[in-house]
C-alpha cells in the first residue's frame, strides 16, 4: 500500500494546521499522540514529514520521514518511520535514514506499523528492543541518545549510505506516493 491523498483535510495534532489527509496520515497522527500523551515527549520537540534530501548521479531526491524527535539543543535524536509491512523488513532503511538525517546523525530510530515496533541503534546497528513498549519515554530517550552520540559521516560513508537509502526508497519514486518523488527544478 502506498500513501495517497484521500482528497480531504484534517487538523494536524502537532502543528494545529490543516493538512492533506492521506492513507497514512491517521497512523502518523496516532504515533504523534502516543509520543506526546503516553511517552511524555514535549510536542514542540516533534516535527512531522521532515525531508532527507540527497542526489544520485546528479539527480536530486527527497524522502519525508514521518516524525523526527529533537533534543533540547535541537539535534535530531530519534526518527520514527511508519511501515505498511513487516517491521523487520524496514529496520535497515530506518537505521540508514537516521544516519543520513540533516543535523545528525540521529542515534536512534523506531520503525513501526502501529501494532509492533523496533527501537534501533542507528550508529551501532541492531535492534535494541521490540514491541510498542520499546518506544522509550522522553527522559529515557534523552539518556539513550546521550550514550549513543554518533560521529558525523565522512563523504565516502555518506555516499555509500545514500545509495543504500535510495535502493530502499527508490521503488516509491514515480509511484503513487505524492510525498516521495524526485525533486525537479
Predicted features along the sequence, with ranges:
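A short glycine-rich, hydrophobically flanked beta-strand micro-motif that places a catalytic Asp/Glu
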Residues: 110
